[in-house]
From Swiss-Prot:
Single GO MF annotation: tRNA binding
Disulfide bonds: none
Highest rank taxon of the organism: Bacteria
Subunit structure: Consists of a catalytic RNA component (M1 or rnpB) and a protein subunit.
Protein name: Ribonuclease P protein component
Catalysed reactions listed for this entry: Endonucleolytic cleavage of RNA, removing 5'-extranucleotides from tRNA precursor
E.C. number(s) listed in UniProt: 3.1.26.5
Family annotation (InterPro entries): Ribosomal_Su5_D2-typ_SF, Ribsml_uS5_D2-typ_fold_subgr, RNase_P
């Protein structure tokens, strides 16, 4: 199940206290959140996506959000748990396809050291 960051203060906490990693298409903020625990003691992640109006019109911004969330969904089982993630799209992401966005995301995840193991799922490979 994909849990989202929804409230402004959740995003602000990740921006202020989290660590950032960047490449040419995306910026990733990561914050280890101790509150991300179920009643059974299982940890989980939350994800938020921010796409500025500079990226394009609403159709383009929505497509970018869908690409980011789908790539995250495919790789979420391989990530360490108990974190809040915020992906910020840069203007250069406009016009990029699914694989290019996935490659950029995997690069940031690797930089941040968030893989549970070395296996990352790639679609269409």
């Amino acid at each position: 199940m994909l849990l989202s960051l929804r409230k402004n203060n959740e995003f602000r906490t990740v921006y202020r206290r989290g660590k950032s990693y960047a490449n040419d298409l995306l910026v990733l903020y990561v914050y280890p959140n101790r509150k991300n625990v179920t009643k059974d003691g299982e940890r989980f992640n939350k994800v938020g996506v921010s796409v500025s109006k500079k990226v394009g019109k609403s159709v383009v911004r929505s497509r970018v959000k869908r690409l980011i969330l789908e790539n995250y969904r495919l790789n979420s089982s391989e990530l360490k748990e108990g974190y809040d993630f915020v992906f910020i799209a840069r203007v250069a992401i406009n016009g990029k396809d699914f694989k290019q966005v996935g490659k950029a995301m995997n690069n940031l995840i690797k930089k941040a050291g968030l893989r549970d193991n070395e296996k990352i799922v790639h679609s269409n490979d």
